[in-house]
Amino acid sequence: MFGRVAVLLGGTSAEREVSLLSGRNVLEVLRVRGVDAQSVDGVPALAQALVERRFDRVFNVLHGHNGGGEDGVVQGLMQAFGVPYTGSDVLGSALSMDKVRTKQVWLALGLPTPRYASLSVCATAVEVRQAVEMLGFPVIIKPAKEGSSVGVSRVFALEHLEEAVALAARYEGELLMEQLIEGDELTVSILDEMALPSIRIVPQGQWYDYNAKYLAEDTQYVCPGLDDVAEAEIARLALAAFRAVGCRGWGRVDVMRERGSGRFFLLEVNTAPGMTTHSLVPKAASQLGMGFDDLVWRILEQTL
């Protein structure tokens, strides 16, 4: 039914290790189910395989950009060769990878997202100070095109600002300085134009950083994360945010719920989310009785 399937993983982005874990999990499921599947590490290897016509479709779990699989580059490559693939197309992938442009689209459509300022990696101390004065502490500083909390800092005082900017500036592209919303962090997985139950994330540390996402064993995940009324509201918001930036197939929308007001604020969209044992899309799917194997199968079926 599927022919020869490439599981695209690894790459050279800052999220390589997570992608390798995701890809191995997906590959194991496909092989157990009798699919002729092979792993392909990175975009150059995929390009060579496509030239040689070695695969009929691609399951993309290549995370990140600049050697990753979420910035539209590899999607354009696959479309050029006429090979179907999982996840969002060129536009949805490229736009979602850029957190600044994503926020601009959401704001233009009246969708709620934290106040922000964009900065170049060469921003002067004066420009950084002006951005902070506009937003007010606390803020989050992050690379505009990275995921998995790579290069992200929470800043509560002026003396920590320079260090946070320097960390984010190690990565390619603009920096995003964003108003820090205090409250519950939630995520809504999208599968086949349907919002899965939200997950409320309860890290044991101060926040949901890289360690809490992929290494810690004590991070708690509450699913569904909200009461029925709020659950319906966040599902509508997540679907609207996903569609606004042209995404399709499957993905994940990260949201904050402000303490006190209960208001939701959109953070970002992930178009090739993790598929590790700690990953959130499999956790949400399991709440509906869908095991990891069935989830992988549903995603691959989107290429037919």
Swiss-Prot record:
**GO BP annotations, alphabetical order:** cell wall organization; peptidoglycan biosynthetic process; regulation of cell shape
* Amino acids binding Mg(2+) 2: E268, N270
InterPro entries registered for this protein in UniProt? ATP-grasp, ATP_grasp_subdomain_1, D-Ala_lig_Van_CS, D_ala_D_ala, Dala_Dala_lig_C, Dala_Dala_lig_N, PreATP-grasp_dom_sf
Q: How is the cofactor bound?
A: Binds 2 magnesium or manganese ions per subunit.
Q: Which cofactor does it need?
A: Mg(2+); Mn(2+)
Which reaction equation describes what this protein catalyses? 2 D-alanine + ATP = D-alanyl-D-alanine + ADP + phosphate + H(+)
Q: Which UniProt keywords apply?
A: ATP-binding, Cell shape, Cell wall biogenesis/degradation, Cytoplasm, Ligase, Magnesium, Manganese, Metal-binding, Nucleotide-binding, Peptidoglycan synthesis
Q: Where does Mg(2+) 1 bind?
A: D254, E268
Gene Ontology molecular function: any one: ATP binding
Q: What is its EC number?
A: 6.3.2.4
Pathways involved: Cell wall biogenesis; peptidoglycan biosynthesis
Q: Where does ATP bind?
A: 132-187
- Any keyword Ribonucleoprotein? no
Q: Which domain of life is it from?
A: Bacteria
Q: What is its main location?
A: cytoplasm
Q: Which GO terms describe its cellular component?
A: cytosol
Q: What does this protein do?
A: Cell wall formation.
Q: PANTHER family under this entry?
A: D-ALANINE--D-ALANINE LIGASE, D-ALANINE--D-ALANINE LIGASE B
Family (UniProt)? Belongs to the D-alanine--D-alanine ligase family.
Name this protein carries in UniProt: D-alanine--D-alanine ligase
User: Lineage, please?
Assistant: Bacteria, Pseudomonadati, Pseudomonadota, Gammaproteobacteria, Lysobacterales
